């Protein structure tokens, strides 16, 4: 039996920065807003009807919840000595959402990471990969050791579709 595919959020800017789900999310909330502008139609000087005009589409968003549980392993995700701790995963997500080089003069380096969310192989009928940025992170710490070590945490991550190539083209044109 093949191994279960795990959801991964990886930085497109730093190949060593990624978070793989310890437990896959129970659900993914994918949404996209479509803008419609309302216009009153006047008939004989009376606003009689409302017409709508397509105004464009907002980027797709994805919300998911990840559970990191090290309760049985003193805060580590597995019994392996080199295993990540719960807080390592939380910090990695926060790092992907943080500005990479705050003092840099280059605006492309003075921004948070572009990310890629994947779950399974490209050839499957699963959720398509999403190039995105992290829009929000909410961490709920659920269990602690006597010394304060975080043993379990639930992290809700909000992501917004972003195409770095298209953004780079717009940036070059606007200079």
Annotate each language-model stretch with its function:
Residues 1-175:
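Acidic, Ser/Thr- and Gly-enriched intrinsically disordered low-complexity segments
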């Amino acid at each position: 039996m093949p191994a279960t595919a795990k959801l991964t959020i990886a930085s497109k800017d730093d190949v060593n920065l990624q978070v793989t789900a310890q437990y896959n999310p129970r659900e993914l909330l994918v949404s996209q807003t479509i803008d419609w502008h309302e216009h009153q139609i006047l008939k004989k000087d009376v606003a009689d009807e409302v017409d709508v005009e397509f105004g464009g589409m907002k980027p797709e968003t994805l919300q998911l919840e990840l559970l990191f549980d090290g309760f049985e392993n003193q805060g580590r995700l597995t019994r392996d000595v080199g295993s990540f701790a719960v807080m390592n995963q939380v910090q990695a997500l926060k790092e992907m959402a943080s500005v990479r080089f705050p003092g840099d003069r280059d605006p492309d380096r003075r921004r948070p990471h572009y990310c890629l969310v994947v779950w399974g192989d490209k050839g499957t009928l699963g959720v398509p990969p999403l190039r995105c940025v992290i829009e929000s992170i909410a961490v709920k710490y659920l269990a602690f050791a006597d010394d304060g070590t975080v043993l379990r945490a639930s992290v809700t991550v909000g992501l917004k579709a972003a195409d770095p190539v298209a953004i780079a083209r717009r940036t070059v044109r606007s200079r």
